[in-house]
């Protein structure tokens, strides 16, 4: 049964508009079940074809030229059926994944509304508040909760978009084929159903006639071996023990097939000597969720018989491969607290590795398609929800009713779709040219750490509205720590880059921010190469796409003036997969990044975009910045060429040169990037000349150091543009 919409006196205000997921998760679960039935039918046909093929052609019943042709045709049909199996596994696991996302979002939203309603009840009964104060506090709480719910819906939509290139988890097909019957709906369990009728709890199992096995699948090729019982001969009549023994959970067969026969063994009778187990299992006082031990001992390569209380001790359910028991919860619900069997099969499953994420975008640990029915989402405690809501209210109240955030500016008629050059495939890339003389401290992407690992959130300015939304969704996002934090950090960086003090009104100038599936953050703007406005700093572990020394300069130049293409090329060169691209609605309107778009709202953008981090010289040329930092004030001129012969300052033409480089941005014609780079090169060379004169004539050490830093920066940019223009010729 799908999760219903929360109700209450303030529920509608906290949900509308856009604060509730209207999709029905049951539709996706039911469709996945229908495809599972199709998969079983296809598998039956495939098994029959394989058996007949082996019997007729490999058993020697038919041979010769015609037999070889028929054998080849049947083999081709078998391959097609196997491909169909793979497609069905993809469809089934995707539907279950989407259903899990919808279910989790609804559960989190319901928790938010319930927690807010409890807080409202407290406020309504608080005698210390007058009517106006009570009304203001309740409205603030309702507004913050609505914002949190809208953010949850948006994040769920982003994750759904990320799954459009979905690939099923490893072994998903095998798990689906092993699943013969789904567990009871809405009751997550780790106990594998017993092959026989269990006895009354507290008494030994009464032996009965063994069930004739089907065709058990043994771990090694060959015909199935008749199960060997621990005691040879006729089963011994059980002896009632002095004290009733609680039956233990039977061990799952090594490779599940049809149910294996039960061979009862009473506690007083010693079983036959089994093979030595890989890891002895310590009996637990009572069944409870715990990591699965090594497989229980089994006599030879036959199917494992159910374990009974004996010398080997009770065992918890597990599989020989150490993988989770098949009865796990749907996607996005695997780590909810309060559900029995949370750590089945050994610990909390980690998310997919980088290679998996690049293929599947989001692959939740429980999305293997194993469960046939949903598990009820475990709600976080009301205390946590209430705390999150109070935090949101406090933030919102401190910031006032309205937001003073700047609206941000985007270019006019400078869409990335216009005359967008395509990046070349990896095999067609030219070898990178010789690097600049000093590249000892090149800032390369570090896959071991994401941007949120090394960048404190306090270093990034944030608007009051965005801070309130982040605070309200903090509890719900705790399960996705890492990926969620990187996306949240990237959103704040994008908002800061679009703040009014980072935007001087230059025509067509704007920033795009992107985050990869492994948490790396990269930014790009529409002007020049390696261009960062004076005074702007970028946080650590945030990469500038056009200043990457590893990428051939001709590829960087092709993406000039197209920041969405720039971040795509950067990710492709480093074999990363973009998770989302962030910008304002105007900046993203005519672009198709191929991944989720996160649109910045006007109240997301802070009044000031001042960030603490690296200067522009540190970003584009870390070794030169380090050399400057190590140079004393008395030796600063050693970093510069000799002073110009003409002691008069050069005429400052930067204003006119800047106007010239803006002209190509008014066009959407093919080749505008080349014209823009030529004009930008002239501006960079002139800025370098002025910085050199200022450095030689400065009398104050601090002013001189700033001028030297400017000269080093423009020297690097000029050299980069020279190489880019030469490569374009």
Curated annotation (Swiss-Prot):
Residues 200-215, 236-255, 315-325, 399-410, 418-432 have a biased composition (Low complexity). Keywords: Cytoplasm. GO terms for cellular component: cytosol; plasma membrane. Signal peptide: none annotated. It comes from the Bacteria. It is found in: Cytoplasm. InterPro entries: ESAT-6-like_sf (IPR036689). Residues 175-366, 399-457 are annotated as: Disordered. Disruption phenotype: Inactivation does not abolish EsxA (ESAT-6) secretion, EsxA-specific immunogenicity and enhanced virulence. Residues 438-450 have a biased composition (Basic and acidic residues). Interacts with EspB and EccCb1. May act as a chaperone that facilitates EspB secretion through an interaction with EccCb1. PANTHER family: BONE MARROW PROTEOGLYCAN (PTHR10068), CELL WALL ADHESIN EAP1 (PTHR10068:SF14). This is ESX-1 secretion-associated protein EspK. The gene is espK.
């Amino acid at each position: 049964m799908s999760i219903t919409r929360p109700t209450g006196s303030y529920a509608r205000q906290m949900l509308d508009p856009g604060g509730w997921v209207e999709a029905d998760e049951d539709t996706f679960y039911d469709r996945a079940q229908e495809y599972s039935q199709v998969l079983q039918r296809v598998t039956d046909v495939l098994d029959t074809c394989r058996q007949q093929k082996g019997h007729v052609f490999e058993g020697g019943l038919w041979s010769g030229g015609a037999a070889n042709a028929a054998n080849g045709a049947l083999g081709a049909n078998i391959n097609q059926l196997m491909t169909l199996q793979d497609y069905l596994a993809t469809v089934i696991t995707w539907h279950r994944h989407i259903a899990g996302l919808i279910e989790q979002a609804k559960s989190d939203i319901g928790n938010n509304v319930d927690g807010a309603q409890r807080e409202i009840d407290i406020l309504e009964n608080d005698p210390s508040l007058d009517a106006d104060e009570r009304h203001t506090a309740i409205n603030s709480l309702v507004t913050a909760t609505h914002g949190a719910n809208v953010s949850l819906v948006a994040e769920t939509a982003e994750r759904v978009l990320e799954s459009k290139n979905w690939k099923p988890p490893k072994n998903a097909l095998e798990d689906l084929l092993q699943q013969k019957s789904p567990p009871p709906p809405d009751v997550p369990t780790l106990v594998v159903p017993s092959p026989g009728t269990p006895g009354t709890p507290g008494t030994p199992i009464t032996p009965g006639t063994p069930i004739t096995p089907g065709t058990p699948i043994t771990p090694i090729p060959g015909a199935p071996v008749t199960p060997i019982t621990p005691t040879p001969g006729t089963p011994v009549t059980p002896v009632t023990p002095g004290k009733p023994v609680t039956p233990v959970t039977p061990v799952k067969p090594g490779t599940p097939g049809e149910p294996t026969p039960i061979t009862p063994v009473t506690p007083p009778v010693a079983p036959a000597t089994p093979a030595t187990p890989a890891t002895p299992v310590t009996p637990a006082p009572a069944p409870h969720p715990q990591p699965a031990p090594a497989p229980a001992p089994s006599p030879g390569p036959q199917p494992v018989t159910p374990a009974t209380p004996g010398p080997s001790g009770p065992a918890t359910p597990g599989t020989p491969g150490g993988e989770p028991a098949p009865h796990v919860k749907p996607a996005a619900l695997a780590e909810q607290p309060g559900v029995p069997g949370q750590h089945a099969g050994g610990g909390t499953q980690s998310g997919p590795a980088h290679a998996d994420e690049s293929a599947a975008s989001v692959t939740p640990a429980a999305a293997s398609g194993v469960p046939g029915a949903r598990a009820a989402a475990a709600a976080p405690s009301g205390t946590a929800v209430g705390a999150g809501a109070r935090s949101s209210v406090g933030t919102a109240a401190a910031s006032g009713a309205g937001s003073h955030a700047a609206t941000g500016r985007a270019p006019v008629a400078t869409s990335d779709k216009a005359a967008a050059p395509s990046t070349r495939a990896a095999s067609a890339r030219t070898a990178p040219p010789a690097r600049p003389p000093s590249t000892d401290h090149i800032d390369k992407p570090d896959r071991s750490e994401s941007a949120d690992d090394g960048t404190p959130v306090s270093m990034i300015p944030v608007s009051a509205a965005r801070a309130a939304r982040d605070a309200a969704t903090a509890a719900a996002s705790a399960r996705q720590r890492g990926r969620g934090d990187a996306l949240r950090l990237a959103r704040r960086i994008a908002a800061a880059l679009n703040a009014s003090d980072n935007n001087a009104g230059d025509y067509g100038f704007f920033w795009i921010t992107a985050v990869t599936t492994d948490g790396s953050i990269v930014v790009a703007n529409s002007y020049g190469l390696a261009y960062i406005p004076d005074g702007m700093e970028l946080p650590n572990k945030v990469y500038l796409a056009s200043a990457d020394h590893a990428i051939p300069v001709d590829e960087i130049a092709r993406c000039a003036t197209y920041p969405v293409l720039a971040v795509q090329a950067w990710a492709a060169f480093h074999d990363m997969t973009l998770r989302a691209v962030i910008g304002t609605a105007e900046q993203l309107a005519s672009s198709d990044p191929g991944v989720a778009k996160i649109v910045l709202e006007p109240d997301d953008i802070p009044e000031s975009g001042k960030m603490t981090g690296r200067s522009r010289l540190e970003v584009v040329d870390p070794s030169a910045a380090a050399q400057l930092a190590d140079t004393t004030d008395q030796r600063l001129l050693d970093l510069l060429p000799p002073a110009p012969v003409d002691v008069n300052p050069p005429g400052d033409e930067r204003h006119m040169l800047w106007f010239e480089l803006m002209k190509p941005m008014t066009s959407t014609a093919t080749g505008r990037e080349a014209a823009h780079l030529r004009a930008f090169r002239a501006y960079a060379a002139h800025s370098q000349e002025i910085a050199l004169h200022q450095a030689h004539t400065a009398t104050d050490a601090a002013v001189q150091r700033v001028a030297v830093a400017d000269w080093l920066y423009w020297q690097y940019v000029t050299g980069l543009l020279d190489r880019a223009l030469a490569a374009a010729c």
